[in-house]
Amino acid sequence: MGTGVAQPPHVVSNADLVKVMDTSDEWIQSRTGVARRRYVAPGVGSVQLAAEAVSAALNDAGVAPGEVDLLVNATMTPDMFAPGNAALVQAEVGLERICAFEIRQQCSGFLYGLELADAMLANGRATTAVVVGAEAHAGYMPFGPTSWAMLRGTHDGPADPDEYAAATDSRAWSVLFGDGAGACVLRRGEDDSGFIGGRLFSDGGSYDLIHVPGIGFSRQPYIDAAQLEAGLCIPQMKGMELFRQAVRAMPSAVTGVLDSVGLSVSDLDLVIAHQANARIVSAVGTALGLDESVVPSNIAEHGNTTAATLPILFHEQRLAGRVGSGALVAFTAFGAGAHWGASLYRVP
């Protein structure tokens, strides 16, 4: 396996957000654990981030673009409504005319992508796969032009009162998210390493835990000024219920997949959990009875990058020497849909 990441250079700290909404560093960190996040510049989207991460992963794996015959792209923030990002990333990276498809499982997108790629490798439909999760959340941040100018350092203030009020109304979710991408290269192995088990779940009855109700084709027109003014084109979140379901679902998925292959929590060397919120990650570790060193977190530095949290964190753990040969790694995520699950990976 090779891994790679891509991150925008523009870092926005909690102190920066204080300038454009009614919040504080203490308020944000105590509720989310986020200290800073990155935002893409205008004109940069998740396609560019994904392409950079894929190229880095291929280089890390020593694999040429022409050897790849499957690309799975996970994002909830595509560059355009249609086509999806997958074909655009394929072209940007210079891959052949291969099977490239996109999935919309939000925070669980990379996890679902791993399982899909592993299945296609196992049945011989692919020999070399790339899975990438990439997000550019800046596009739906509730900031107006004056606020963006202040965050980018091109305007000293004061804040626009209407923009300040609108951003404050959305602070429960907007302080969480950041932009970034992570990718991995997978090949079919001949031994008992690689992905050895997985369990995926969905529950549409919980769709409104976090969702964007506007911009849908049940509406005519599918987007209009009224939706924008009503805030229907930005996320709506039921934070407490989301927390409760996530801290139950992820540990249950991990123990379930361990049971299915005859292993236990004590066999785990590392848990790569979706970085939704520092308290959620901590609660997952507690529920599994694992030390925080086994369930690491990087949300303080990146925020919640949805489909990119798993590959970015795994890449960082590889660089830190935490992913040695033979190590047993559990990937787990819970996100909008609701979609969740867990996968077990034995490092070759």
What are these regions (language model features)?
Residues 65-69, 95-99, 123-129, 171-172, ...:
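Short coil/turn connectors at secondary-structure junctions
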Residues 118-176:
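Flexible, glycine-rich active-site loops centered on histidine and acidic residues
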Residues 11-12, 82-84, 140-145, 340-344:
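Short acidic, glycine/serine/threonine-rich loops at helix termini
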Residues 1-4, 74, 104, 129-135, ...:
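Short beta-strand segments
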Residues 21-30, 81-94, 142-162, 217, ...:
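Acidic-glycine-rich active-site phosphate/pyrophosphate-binding loop
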Residues 47, 51-54, 58, 77-78, ...:
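Claisen-condensing/thiolase-fold acyl-transfer catalytic domains that form or cleave C-C bonds
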Residues 61, 65-77:
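Membrane helical hairpin/interfacial module
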Residues 1-42, 162-241, 252, 346-348:
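Condensing-enzyme catalytic core mediating Claisen C-C bond formation in acyl metabolism
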